[in-house]
Amino acid sequence: MTDKLIIFDTTLRDGEQSPGASMTKEEKIRIAKHLERMKVDVIEAGFAASSNGDFDAIHTIAGLIKDSTICSLARANDKDIQRAADALKPAESFRIHTFIATSPLHMEKKLRMTPDQVFEQARLAVRFARKFTDNVEFSPEDGSRSDMDFLCRVLEAVIAEGATTINIADTVGYGVPELYGNLVKTLRERIPNSDKAIFSVHCHNDLGMAVANSLAGVKIGGARQIECTINGLGERAGNTSLEEIVMAVKTRKDYFGLDVGIDTSQIVPTSKLVSQITGFVVQPNKAVVGANAFAHASGIHQDGVLKARDTYEIMRAEDVGWTANKIVLGKLSGRNAFKQRLQELGVSLDSESELNAAFMRFKDLADRKAEIFDEDIIAIVSEESALAHEQEHFKFVSLSQHSETGEQPHAKVVFGVEGKEVTGEARGNGPVDATFNAIESEVGSGSELLLYSVNAITTGTQAQGEVTVRLSKSGRIVNGVGTDPDIVAASAKAYISALNKLHSKDDKVNPQRS
């Protein structure tokens, strides 16, 4: 009988710490529903004490998700833990994840605490968390750079207090596979009560070894939980990639001897959703979910795949949710056909009004674009769902622009400001620059444009463009996304979406990193 590997997803918490990846409550809910559909074991929905917005998102997700355990991060103090417990009350199954730094560097320079003080705070934090649930996780932050004797002492104490999961954090991505795997192994061997807890690994990708270190923690160290994010999303170089972990363990079950309960057909749809929401485009050569992951350019490889796919493919594209572009609907398709296709794609909308709005967007697109693909439908629904829940201080209405070779383009943008239509006009160094200048001529947001990117949703010259705009103001970074066959119109929509997020400010306490 094989062991079960627990998949702990922290896209909504650690992934969101990536600059520019902050999500609204509604965006978090959409991702959480996809993670549940994927059958993720544990969803870390956020850090409840960081802000009222994060508390509310965790509380709502806890009430909606039934098939995954919902978790909140909490620093090792009563206030944070109480806040996490309150946020998690609606959940059918929940976990409190508390942590404190244990490395000499962090204790001295950041916490300004002695080892004995850290030991006592860790022990008491777990004891307090156990008052709310018997599912308590403890992480020694910067565990991979901690003194072994002290680490063993702390972990033995928190297990004695009732911690059921011990998560060894390689917070700065310093570990290498053999050493990290042996660290986990040594801890399990030296701690007398280690058999009372499941050991977990949490690795960062600063040296490009997050996945390798995590797998070593499992194979060498005996860990049975991996903490990871969709697309490896996370601050600095990112976190361990969920899709790579899952497919490595499934594809090489002969080596790892572990079962994972993930529905792998949901991997690519979830990857695309996270990319669309955060604006972090997946690189084409990214394992499993990159556009080129199953592409073969070499003639020898193409010949082999045509004769027998397993000559050059160790997993099937359809097993992870890749589907060929497929024309599914046209301008004569009705509302019922549209609704049925959404159900087939596993896409849900919260209300009939959202469905009606999405259908009208579809009909408008069908009048302008001869071929409608699944990807087009997903983009329409994603944007419509975001608009339905977005605080629409600003609303795009229309755009016209004119340019001639050798002259600065001119743009005129009509948009709503709290229900009142205004018109902005301006010139710029290109049609997009002119469009943004036209919006700012009326808004005067004072924000800085950090990123502008365009991604074709499907192939061909009629493809919709998906534009991501990243704005920064007063240290706050937000993303806006817009889609349209007209790239300049998509750009205006994305810019206005980002402005709406800047307008609905939700300040967060910056947590210690785990």
UniProtKB/Swiss-Prot annotation:
Catalytic activity: 3-methyl-2-oxobutanoate + acetyl-CoA + H2O = (2S)-2-isopropylmalate + CoA + H(+)
GO terms for MF: 2-isopropylmalate synthase activity; acetyl-CoA C-acetyltransferase activity; manganese ion binding
Cofactor dependence: Mn(2+)
Superkingdom as given in the UniProt entry: Bacteria
Family (UniProt): Belongs to the alpha-IPM synthase/homocitrate synthase family. LeuA type 1 subfamily.
Subunit structure: Homodimer.
Protein name listed in UniProt: 2-isopropylmalate synthase
Taxon lineage: Bacteria, Pseudomonadati, Pseudomonadota, Betaproteobacteria, Burkholderiales
